[in-house]
Amino acid sequence: TSISIGIFNSQNGKNIFSETCSCTTNINNINQDLNQLENILEKKIFEVEKKTKNFLNEVYLMVETSYSNSIGLSLFKDNEDNLLQKKDILYLIQDARQQILRANKNQSIIHILITKYIIDLNEFDILPLDKKCKNFSLDIKFILIPEILLKKIEKIFNKNHIVVKKI
């Protein structure tokens, strides 16, 4: 397992700190004790706080693990020549999200990616809102990880008084 840390200035996006270090803890083994990972993270948190002269209060994480699961769906709606609105898209995504969670107990959705919009048989990369259409569909990819792994990672940061905003 390797840990990559990047700290960016929130005003200008400039990279302040970046480092990759190796760790023998295998986060892919969700039953393993994560003490070494915890020690490395505590050390890196201290380094980052020293370098930035600020306490870390919250983090956004990217986690790669063989325990992640990817589920793709295509959702279709007959729109009856009405205007396509953001609320229509959000409703479909929320409905799919609930179905995914019901079917995958003990998993957490960490990412929802819309890979394609198809409106009246025309493909779009970006959703054209407020356009009349007969029907539309979305291709969505959900990325999940086990809740137990998510809780272990959050616990490590919580011990250091850091909130995990998003994984």
Language-model features, listed with the residues they occupy:
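Two-metal-ion RNase H-like nuclease active-site motif
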Residues: 1
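Nucleotide/phosphate-binding catalytic cleft detector across ATP-hydrolyzing
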Residues: 6-58, 63-167
